Amino acid sequence: MKNITVLGVTGSIGTQTIDVVLGHPDEFKIVAMSAGHNIKKLEEIMSQLPVAHICVLEQADYDYLTEKYPDRHFYLGQEGLIQISTLEETEIVLNAIVGFAGLLPTIEAIKAGKDIALANKETLVVAGHIIIPLAKEYNIQLLPVDSEHSAIFQSMHGEYPREISKILLTCSGGSFRDKSLNELKDATVEQALNHPNWSMGAKITIDSATLVNKGLEVMEAKWLFDVDYDDIEVLIHPESVVHSMIECTDTAVIGQLGTPDMRLPIQYALTYPHRIPLMNSKRLSLSDIGTLHFYKPDTIRFKALPLAYRAGRAGGSMPCVFNGANEEANQLFRDGKIKFLEIVDLIEDAMNAHNVVENPTLDELIKIDADARAFVRKRVGL
């Protein structure tokens, strides 16, 4: 029985984690969880699982839940996230919080000796230079939940790091992979949220449409697997069957294949190094699929990808600016305040205006993130 804290339990990754846990009640126990604004969904989960420790974002929600459920322990805000991430009984923290907000709980959980199942890629994008040394210092396991990074992690089993020459990061292409640049000018939120393969939250689905998500994954892969940016290649793979691959020095290519089901990488992060059956899952039939396609991304239509490589190579505080500007612009697009193509334009503008801080501290990163968001809002007159 493994004791788990789930951060971001009402989101897409969080609810799929619940599905994994309910499928294996003898393997997993959720001892703590957090939610943002979806209190109705949180209460549904509370009715399914007797989770003792629960953190919420808003004071009003905290007051409501404390009164309604006197037998549960409730926590509030950022401090509450840290408290439930460092509980003595917690063995592994699955961090599925969206965005920069997931950083501090990850840091404190590592310091408390907890293994981390990381779905919050922004943590490594923004602060990989802090997280990776901390993970080594406290001798914890940092396990990827992103399907691509889980695939790379699985493909590396039995290989010596020095014998891996390249990472091949696959990409569905998002909602607009077949749209022209002209068609993208008036793309709507509804169109962007219609992902062809994966069921995900709104923010990451928009990020997939801009290819910002793949850019974030490139930066995450650099930190997770200690590879140079020149050795990370992105391939558009519309079928989302090959979740990513590695190329070895002898030219062998090793990959992980499967149906597009996020529960698989979630479950593997929780059971590593073992495997157990994935309940209610569909097995991959290559004969039914027949043909798999791979091609290079169009970096003129989707300039977020070269911008991400630029941010990663610049290093220091630049990935924080890339991420912060994107989080703000992504939200503005979902709120109907900017057009689709403006998202990446605003990221580029924020990067161009930024002077890189070489080795930013946590406090500096918090300020840089806030400044990038403020820059974007000011740029659009807000």
Predicted regions and their residues:
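Catalytic, metal-anchored helix/loop core of enzyme active sites in primary metabolism
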Residues: 1-382
